[in-house]
Design a protein with these regions (language model features):
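Pan-zinc metallopeptidase signature
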Residues: 1, 151-235
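Auxiliary, metal-adjacent structural segments of Zn-dependent hydrolase domains
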Residues: 5-76
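Second-shell loop/turn segments in exported
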Residues: 16-26, 96-101, 169-170
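Hydrophobic (often cysteine-bearing) scaffold residues that line and stabilize catalytic clefts
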Residues: 26-29, 82, 106, 175
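Surface-exposed patches in mature extracellular/periplasmic domains of secreted proteins
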Residues: 43-53, 97-103, 121-131, 195-199
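Short pre-active-site segment immediately N-terminal to the catalytic Zn-binding motif
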Residues: 68-85, 96-105
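Active-site His/Glu-centered metal-binding helix of metallohydrolases
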Residues: 85-97, 109, 113
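Post-HExxH zinc-binding segment in Zn-dependent metallohydrolases
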Residues: 104-149
Length: 235
């Protein structure tokens, strides 16, 4: 096994059975996604990170305590890796546990992250001449995202019953994708909203959704507050 340092992020590593030469494109994808997160959703605290490829029922997942992210993919599947890594890195950059009644919102936002960052990644790679293979591959990140979003189940976000259903089971993936599909245009037009996401875990657990949005708006950077109000109107 190899512990491969990401070239642009010295504190981040890929634990892989492949050497750096064979994992080059994979490393570039991880590196670029972290750089995009640094731009839009900066970490509240700089932490090391080890990414491992783990085929198991619990993967993909992140472990904040041990600074690890597991991806359930193979080194050649860079679109799948980008999709999973963006989702898990979104979780990883929320430093505190999110209240159980808001975990569905966290899951839906992290699903949104997959699609937002894959599309930004496609643009970055399409203009980079030093990674020819990934430059040619770049449009596939967008098509992968589009295909995933099609696999969703419609959710009425103004229905208290449907919100309650997601509160009780926040891993309803088809519903998460539906919510993500409705959040994505807002994040694309108001990317400053990503700066508020790390503060989701600061919202106390005893509040309902309207009050939680109010608290989230107060504790987030001032530049995000209008965008949070716009998100609340979706629900």
């Amino acid at each position: 096994m190899y512990l491969l340092r990401l070239p642009e992020h010295p504190g981040c590593y890929l634990y892989s059975e492949h050497n750096a030469r064979n994992a080059d494109n994979f490393l570039v994808v991880l590196d670029e996604i972290i750089s995009l997160f640094d731009m839009y959703m900066p970490a509240r605290e700089e932490l090391p990170l080890r990414v491992s490829l783990v085929r198991s029922e619990e993967s993909p997942c992140c472990f904040r305590g041990s600074h690890e992210i597991y991806l359930n993919t193979e080194i050649q599947y860079v679109s799948q890796a980008a999709y999973q890594f963006s989702h898990e890195l979104c979780h990883y950059r929320i430093p505190y546990l999110v209240a159980e009644n808001l975990k569905w919102l966290e899951e839906s936002i992290c699903e949104t992250a997959s699609h937002f960052y894959m599309r930004r990644l496609a643009h970055i790679l399409s203009v980079k001449s030093n990674h020819t293979a990934l430059k040619e591959y770049a449009p596939r990140f967008v098509s992968y995202s589009e295909n995933v979003l099609k696999d969703c189940r419609k959710v009425d976000l103004h229905s208290p019953l449907q919100i309650r259903r997601m509160e009780l089971n926040w891993y309803l993936r088809e519903e998460n994708r539906c919510v993500a599909g409705q959040l994505l245009p807002l994040f694309e037009t108001r990317p400053v909203l990503w700066q508020a996401v790390p503060f989701l875990g600061d919202i106390p657990p005893e509040f309902g959704l309207p009050d939680s949005f109010m608290i989230w708006k107060k504790i987030s950077p001032a530049v995000c507050r209008q965008a949070i109000e716009e998100m609340q109107s979706i629900f």
